[in-house]
UniProtKB/Swiss-Prot annotation:
Protein name per its UniProtKB record: Protein Jumonji
Motif GSGFP motif in this chain: 874-878
Function in brief: Regulator of histone methyltransferase complexes that plays an essential role in embryonic development, including heart and liver development, neural tube fusion process and hematopoiesis. Acts as an accessory subunit for the core PRC2 (Polycomb repressive complex 2) complex, which mediates histone H3K27 (H3K27me3) trimethylation on chromatin. Binds DNA and mediates the recruitment of the PRC2 complex to target genes in embryonic stem cells, thereby playing a key role in stem cell differentiation and normal embryonic development.
Residue stretches making up the JmjC domain: 884-1048
GO biological process: cardiac muscle cell proliferation; cellular response to leukemia inhibitory factor; central nervous system development; chromatin remodeling; facultative heterochromatin formation; liver development; negative regulation of cardiac muscle cell proliferation; negative regulation of transcription by RNA polymerase II
Native organism: Homo sapiens
Note on domains (UniProt): The ARID domain is required to target the PRC2 complex to its target genes.
Region called Disordered, residue ranges: 1-22, 59-150, 169-299, 357-548, 1208-1246
Length: 1246
């Protein structure tokens, strides 16, 4: 036994034990192996009797000088292979430990097996100590050398039992899989380099035995040399795996060609190491055994390159220095000793094997798939990153060793370690997820500084080539690979790129959420934009980079940088710069450096998303949509309904592209037989991180495409004709698909829409449109008088029932999503980013790809966005009294109460005075639109990626209407109405038509201020969270009043009542005697009073004499108040009292159908009475009587006239009861004007 390894006290057992194999069988196996080794030694002695002395002399000379005279190429081969095999120990079958002594003069140990399985771990030190090798001479030929110095492990005996009686059984125990020390690797590498010449007697000493032709070269004369025995023993598992997975015939032919090419290469390059030349000669002499030659040479070259040991560096080194290096150097090879990994029954090729394949393939004249043509799809996908890095490492290591060693230490040369790192990275990202969802600007910068040391490994993992520095070699090698291996290239090149894409998907949204978009993206773009307001176009050109020439016509919006003193009150500051920036439609405000509010969001807050089909945001119809319509039509004929596309990893599957790709690859059967599902999933850009992506992909094919795929080409053409005919009929009846809205009949919209309206997505109705709203009203209402009052409603329902064809919802591009948490949304955003981009893109790249998708419509892209009411889930701004910036004027939760905003009189109105969060991902879009009330608003980007804004000033409205009407071919439909139906038109197209379009890129921590009437569009560049709220100054009231009348005419529901706002302003400002405000609203109050009183008189003249008052809280009610109970409908919120015809929000008065609780505004009620010729069941409900309205308006006009010295514009009707009326008017409290609820009602008939 060895001195360092004491003999164990072995207890003799006659029964089986659970650990290892029975002792009795182990002794028998040892005897069998001993006899096998002895027989092999004897046969070698007989065959090489003449070469024993010469071989020993060569070994002695090798230790003393740089010449190799008698060892022969066979020994040199074994030493070269030993250099390679030092890097190649299997993670599953081999042992990465060294249990033996290097010195041959030490006592040879008795052959003994360990009892337990060795358990070496990837990228970890071996479990046994490393022995220090003494530079002693080899033993004489007469010394007993039948036994190997190796201490075989249990795996070796199990391997022997499995291979017994087959040609795969090694001739010698030295071929089994004990590992070795890195010190020996260094020694063997140096010895190989020091060999200058080779003798020709190797041809006679390399006879092969009929039992195993591959292994004869490693033992020459019965002595087990350190180099040859260890290298061959290390090499054998590689050969065994190759025998399982590769075709031997192809290997032999390709290896023979590789050998001859290497011989030519060594002859053409005399500057290489002399050992290369001698190896070539040895190969030429023993060319009848090509597989092992190929393995030895290639592994020697590749592994030495990976470890950074160059032969040129050691040519001039002496033996003494080589020995010293061998004894002192650490053992880096333990991080890369992996030969094969068995996963799910398939043998996965790993580091050294793929290095061998990569180095061998460029030397073939013909394409060869002998090495990895049997790799399964799952195996390829799990190791695609490692293969990609190996391809890059091959070129990188030629020029620099330390750089590769740095990669080696980071643990990326083994698939198992690569998988572990991927899992670790996912764990780290999961830990960072909460922080990434809600980081403020302050946290973003801290996180960016903390992540700087970690970002290079992440980038190297996703794209090893560019990160490793010597990328000059890698492209050349890839070119060789593409030139020589034609069949393998498409798949390999695809799988080189896909891991890169998946990695970017995992890192990009995280980086964006951690503020890298705030800092790193600024480095990629010009910094002139935020620095100067006077040079917006320069920064725009810098940001857009190589954009199209047509985009040059767009100007950048002004960028404002207020000082700390100016950055106090937003409305005062905006008013001060309004004259300069309002003509652009919007401006961007960069706060002072000390403005850093912390963004606090609940990671688990849930909200309902909206699904946007980006490819349908322009023209609804395209090649992808047409194919999907054919699939849906066929499924419908089979009785299969596909309401939603299948989801994989939160991303919608592109069925049309799926069908095309699977047919291009030969159909499902061929994809399954060739195990191409992984490749197909990559081509569909399904994230690799998606759970069970292959299973879900196969399930989707069987469920939705199998039947359609089985149709004949004639049936496919017939389906296409039917779909196109149906589309033509639909467009003839309703016009272009872009003009179809999700609720074409606004006048029958029974309930208000409470979702926020910021002029971006513009109040998208649920995906079921009017029908779902109709169901919410209740079946009881449809069974009674409403059918008499609204006979046309039945017609609408009938039309929709008739339109249950395939194309009935193809005009939609925005759908209602599902309820998700913020964490889930973030992960979905990360997956979609990885689908669309292979690395973190710049805003210019995202902009270019976005408009390509919108215009070409060749693939299905679905993204999500969400709007969250901060009143429910909390704001991103600090709100606690003790928190910094919680009372700052630019805090958007404080802005609605700003004294300069007239909207403060409305109270809390969702989507108007209550801020809301906009949560988006890459390509999330706010289509061209303006706020329906033409209200200005402020948007603040809390965290995440940049947002690209486009703006058209309000002055371009008329020109824009004409252009849009022409572009969209709106047959009678107003152009702006179609534009606001979620239609995206490229700013380039609008610029060419003469429309002024301005652009800017909002970054995290910046404000965007949109002015009244501007048309705005926004595209997100990744996961982002922003917050928006409206404001309004006195100057807006005139525009708002006209807008309210237009919305009433178009039957569009308003989020608040303009009458209520005007009366609340009059009530509040009259007490303060705010002259400028009162003078602005006085004319509007006059017009409102005249219209209200005129319509009441017309209804009275038409026969409506029944009336009642609601919303009063004083004691001025009549005696009849206590006789009637308040009706249920009077308890409804004011926002729910909408006219069923025009959606007008009734505040001053309404007409009610008492039996059915149906509400009309006065104008619509007058039309109804004229049409029905009866007022039966109708009652007028009013908030203020005629005298109160007149008194309020007179009061305002009186205060204005006091300032102006004139009362001619004020209409007054003095009556004997003016005093009481005046008191009643004064007693009306503001709480009554809010009319949130009514406690009593009075009804009387006259």
């Amino acid at each position: 036994m060895s001195k360092e390894r004491p003999k164990r006290n072995i207890i003799q057992k006659k029964y089986d034990d659970s650990d290892g194999i029975p002792w009795s069988e182990e002794r028998v196996v040892r005897k069998v192996l001993y006899l096998s080794l002895k027989e092999f030694k004897n046969s070698q002695k007989r065959q090489h009797a003449e070469g024993i002395a010469g071989s020993l002399k060569t070994v002695n000379g090798l230790l003393g000088n740089d010449q190799s005279k008698g060892l022969g190429p066979a020994s040199e081969q074994s030493e070269n292979e030993k250099d390679d095999a030092s890097q190649v120990s299997s993670t599953s079958n081999d042992v990465s430990s060294s249990d033996f002594e290097e010195g041959p003069s030490r006592k040879r140990p008795r052959l003994q097996a360990q009892r337990k399985f060795a358990q070496s771990q990837p990228n970890s030190p071996s479990t046994t100590p490393v022995k220090i090798v003494e530079p002693l001479l080899p033993p004489p030929a007469t010394q007993i050398s039948d036994l190997s110095k190796r201490k075989p492990k249990t795996e070796d005996f199990l391997t022997f039992l499995c291979l017994r009686g087959s040609p795969a059984l090694p001739n010698s125990m030295v071929y089994f899989g004990s590992s070795q020390d890195e010190e020996e690797v260094e020694e063997e590498d140096d010895e190989t380099e020091d060999v200058k010449t080779a003798t020709n007697n190797a041809s006679s000493s390399c006879q092969s035995t009929p039992r195993k032709g591959k292994t004869h070269k490693h033992v020459h004369n019965g002595h087990v040399f350190n180099g040859s025995s260890r290298s061959t023993r290390e090499k054998e598992p590689v050969q065994k795996h190759k025998s399982k997975e590769a075709t031997p015939a192809k290997e032999k032919h390709s290896d023979h060609r590789a050998d001859s090419r290497r011989e030519q290469a060594s002859a053409n390059h005399p500057a290489a190491a002399p050992s290369t030349g001698s190896s070539a000669k040895g190969l030429a002499a023993t060319h009848h055994h090509p597989p092992l030659h190929r393995s030895a040479q290639d592994l020697r070259k590749q592994v030495s390159k990976v470890n950074g040991v160059t032969r040129m560096s050691s040519l001039g080194a002496g033996v003494t220095s080589a020995k010293k290096m061998r004894e002192v150097r650490p053992s880096p090879s333990k991080t890369v000793k992996y030969t094969a990994t068995v996963t799910k029954g398939a043998v996965t090729y790993t580091k050294a094997k793929r290095e061998l394949v990569k180095d061998t393939k460029p030397n073939h004249h013909k394409p060869s798939s002998a090495v990895n043509h049997t790799i399964s799809g799952k195996t390829e996908s799990s190791n695609a990153k490692t293969r990609k890095q190996v391809l890059s490492l091959g070129g990188a290591s030629k020029s620099t060793g330390p750089a590769v060693n740095g990669l080696k230490v980071s643990g990326r040369l083994n698939p198992k370690s690569c998988t572990k790192e991927v899992g670790g990275r996912q764990l780290r990202e999961g830990l960072q997820l909460r922080e990434g969802l809600r980081n403020s600007k302050r946290r973003l910068e801290e996180a960016h500084q903390a992540e700087k040391p970690q970002s290079p490994p992440k980038k190297m993992k996703g794209a090893a080539g560019p990160a490793e520095g010597p990328g000059k070699k890698a492209p050349a090698e890839r070119g060789l690979l593409n030139g020589h291996v034609k069949k393998e290239v498409p798949e390999r090149s695809l799988e080189r790129n896909r891991p890169k894409r998946a990695t970017a998907g995992k890192s990009t949204p995280g980086r964006q959420a951690h503020g890298k978009a705030d800092s790193a993206s600024c480095e990629n773009r010009s910094t002139s934009q935020p620095e100067s307001v006077h040079k917006p176009q320069d920064s725009g050109k810098a940001e857009k980079g190589g954009g199209k020439a047509g985009w040059a016509a767009m100007d950048e919006i002004p960028v404002l940088r207020p000082s700390a003193k100016e950055f106090h009150d937003p409305l005062i500051y905006i008013e001060s710069v309004r004259a300069q920036v309002e003509k652009f439609g919007m401006c961007r405000v960069i706060p002072p450096p000390d403005w850093r509010p912390e963004c606090k969001l609940n990671d688990e807050m849930r909200f309902v998303t909206q699904i946007q089909h980006i490819h349908k945001l322009g023209r609804r119809w395209g090649p992808n949509v047409q194919r999907l319509a054919c699939i849906k039509k066929h499924l419908k004929s089979q009785g299969i309904t596909m309401d939603e596309l299948p989801l994989i990893g939160g991303c919608e599957l592109d069925l049309a592209c799926f069908f095309r790709l699977i047919n291009e690859m030969g159909g499902m059967q061929q994809v399954t037989d060739l195990k191409k599902w992984n490749k197909l999933a990559d081509m569909l850009r399904i994230p690799r991180t998606a759970q069970d992506r292959l299973a879900k992909l196969q399930e989707a094919y069987c469920q939705y495409l199998l039947s359609y795929d089985s149709l004949s080409p004639e049936e496919h053409r017939r389906l296409e004709k039917e779909v196109l005919m149906e589309k033509e009929i639909l467009e003839k009846r309703k016009g272009p698909l872009e003009g179809h809205t999700e609720n074409d009949h606004h006048k029958f919209h029974p309930l208000p829409r409470f979702e926020p309206k910021n002029g971006l997505i513009h109040g998208v109705a649920p995906r079921n449109g009017f029908r779902s709203k109709l169901k919410e009203v209740g079946q009881a209402q449809l069974k009674t008088g409403r059918r008499r009052l609204f006979a046309q409603e039945k017609e609408v329902v009938k039309e929709e029932e008739e339109d249950k064809g395939v194309l009935n919802d193809f005009h939609k591009c925005i759908y209602k999503g599902r309820s998700v948490s913020l964490t889930t949304f973030y992960r979905t955003a990360r997956n979609i980013m990885s689908m669309c981009f292979s690395k973190e893109p710049a805003p210019a790249e995202i902009e270019q790809e976005y408009w390509r998708l919108v215009e070409e419509k060749d693939c299905h892209v679905a993204v999500h966005c969400g709007k969250v009411d901060t009143n429910t889930h909390g704001s991103g701004f600090p709100v606690g009294k003790s928190e910094p910036f919680s009372r700052h004027g630019w805090n958007l939760t404080v802005l609605p109460n700003n004294t300069g905003s007239i909207l403060r009189h409305l109270g809390a109105v969702p989507g108007v005075t209550i801020p809301w969060l906009n949560i988006g991902m890459v390509f999330s879009t706010s289509c061209w639109s303006r706020d329906q009330n033409h209200l200005p608003y402020i948007d603040y980007l809390h965290t995440g990626a940049d947002c690209i804004w486009y703006c058209i000033p309000a002055e371009e409205e008329n020109k824009l209407e004409d252009v849009v009407h022409t572009l969209l071919q709106a047959n009678g439909t107003p152009g702006l109405q179609m534009l606001e139906s979620n239609v995206m038109i490229s700013p380039e197209v609008l610029c060419k038509e003469g429309i002024k379009v301005h652009r800017t890129v909002q970054q995290s921590g910046q404000f965007v201020v949109c002015f009244p009437g501007s048309f705005v569009s926004k595209v997100c560049c990744g996961y982002s969270v922003s917050e928006t709220v409206h404001f309004a100054t006195t100057q807006w009231t005139s525009m708002g009043f006209e807008t309210a009348k237009e919305m009433k005419r178009r039957h569009i529901a308003k989020p608040f009542s303009m009458e209520k706002l005007l009366y609340q302003i009059a009530q509040a400002e009259a007490k303060k005697e705010n002259g400028p405000t009162l003078s602005t609203i006085s004319a509007l109050l006059d017009e409102l009073r005249d219209t209200e009183l005129r319509q009441r008189r017309q209804l009275f003249e038409a026969g409506l004499h029944s009336s009642a008052r609601y919303g009063s809280h004083d004691g001025s009610s009549t005696v009849a108040d206590g006789k009637k109970k308040p009706r249920k409908w009077l308890q409804l919120e004011t926002s729910e009292r909408r006219c069923q015809i025009c959606q007008h929000l009734c505040y001053l008065s309404m007409v009610v159908q008492e039996n059915e609780n149906v509400v009309f505004c006065l104008e619509c009620a007058l039309r109804h009475v004229e049409k029905q010729k009866s007022c039966r069941g109708l009652k007028l409900m009013y908030r203020y009587d005629e005298e109160q309205i007149i008194s309020l308006v007179n009061q305002i006009c009186g205060k204005v006239s006091g300032k102006n010295g004139s009362i001619e514009n004020c209409l007054s009707k003095p009556t004997p009861k003016r005093g009481p009326r005046k008191r009643a008017t004064v007693d009306v409290p503001p709480s009554r004007l809010s009319a949130s609820s009514s406690s009593k009602s009075a009804s009387s008939s006259s």
